[in-house]
Every structure is written in C-alpha cells, then in structure tokens.
A protein has these predicted regions:
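A penicillin-recognizing enzyme superfamily signal
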Residues: 2-3, 49-222
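Active-site-adjacent helix/loop patches that line small-molecule binding or acyl-intermediate pockets
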Residues: 1-62, 108
Length: 223
C-alpha cells in the first residue's frame, strides 16, 4: 500500500469472495449499483465520486465507524427558531483495531511512500495519512488525505474518458492531485478560526498490535 504495489491487492482479493467485497464497499458508503462482483474490483475499475471516497476514508479516521454524508445539520426560520435538526447515520463497519491498522498503513504512504512529497516538498509535518491514485492511460489523478479531525480528497481529470495526461510522470496522483490537497491543508491550518489543530494525534487503540494475522486476512478484517 505504501508504494502502490497493486499486485498485493490482487493477491488479497484472490482470497476474498468478490460478493463479500462488494458488500464491504456498500458499508463504506460507495454506490455499488451496476457493479459486477469480480476479482478485478481491487484495482478500482469502477467510478466513484470524491464525496463517496471521502465518506469511505472517514471510516478509518473515525475508529471504524462510517458516517453517511450530511450537508444540512439544521433549519432555522427567519427569527432564528430551529425548525428541524438532522443527525448523520452512523454504523460500525470494522473494528477500531482494524481501522487503526489501515490508518497505520495509510500514514506510511505519506511518511515513506508515494505521498512523501507532502513532507519533503510541502513541509506538512503533522500526523496525517493518505493515498495516491492513478488510472489507466493517466486519465485520473487522485489523492485522498486525512488528519484525526478532517478527511478530504482531490480528483484531477475530465468527464470525457478520452481526456488524459501524456505520461505517468505528469498524470499520477502524486503529481497532479497531491499538490492541490497539500496547498488546501496549508490554508486550513493557517486559518485558526476553523479549529483544526496541526498537532492533533490519532488515537491508538489499547493493546494495538500492528501485525496482520492469517486469521485476519481469511476473515476479511484487513479490508
């Protein structure tokens, strides 16, 4: 995961029922309508919106609990009286320990992997994790990133699938999407009124073991 070695994802997928994997995607907030359960799903051949991806990644930062996106939290009348309040739907998708295992791997993407320029080029040294993404023919460049309190993402591409970058060097997520996310996070941390603390740390589950056992893989807990 740190270096985007997709063959590892393919090896894991060969040990997981594609139908079960599809159910897991739904649990994480990905719209799976029209997606055929196939082993190639691990390589991301189907489309997903930035909103869906942010929703999915928030599960890792939120201790394994998925929170459905909510764009309106309350409605007030012209006098300031609250007409209605809305609460997001939440459900536990994976255990807190499994969520932190994913966090641990995604943090290594930034600390020593494909997202390394977050540190050495953009000088963001706070606790954070992320993942770069690049599709075939360099048509899409992705970067999903998160801190303990904020999950966000960036996609660079075109609605027309024939639009693509000329080369992997220019079209990869680390080159096209990551810089946008990095500048955005710099703005977020610079604006103290937003209340995001760059020194905030991720909560480590009590008794956390960073090793993934064979039983975890067979049971699908490492998803």
């Amino acid at each position: 995961l740190t270096m985007s070695n997709n063959w590892i994802s393919a090896a894991l997928m060969s040990r997981i029922n594609p139908q079960d994997f599809l159910r897991t995607l739904r649990d994480f907030g990905i719209n799976t309508y029209g997606i055929y359960p196939s082993i190639v799903l691990c390589l991301g051949p189907n489309e997903a919106s930035v909103s869906e991806m942010v929703s999915a990644y928030s599960t890792f930062a939120n201790h394994g609990i998925h929170t459905s996106p909510l764009f309106v939290t309350k409605i007030e009348d012209s006098d300031g009286n609250v007409v209605a309040n809305f609460q997001p739907r939440m459900n536990e998708v994976i255990s807190e320990e499994s969520a932190y295992k994913m966090l641990d791997m995604l943090m290594s993407v930034i600390d020593q992997g494909t997202g390394g320029r977050i540190r050495y080029k953009y000088k963001l040294d706070c606790p954070m994790g992320g993942k770069t993404g690049t599709t075939n023919r360099n048509s899409d460049a992705w970067f999903m990133g998160f801190t303990p309190s904020l999950v966000s993402g960036c996609w660079v591409g075109g609605e027309d699938r024939d639009i693509h970058f000329d080369s992997m060097r220019m079209g990869q997520g680390a080159t096209m999407a990551l810089p946008i996310w990095a500048y955005y996070m710099k703005k977020v941390f610079a604006d103290r009124s937003l209340g995001y603390d760059p020194k905030e740390k991720f909560d480590i589950p009590e008794g956390f073991n960073s090793c993934v056992s064979e039983d975890d893989v067979d049971a699908g807990y490492s998803l």
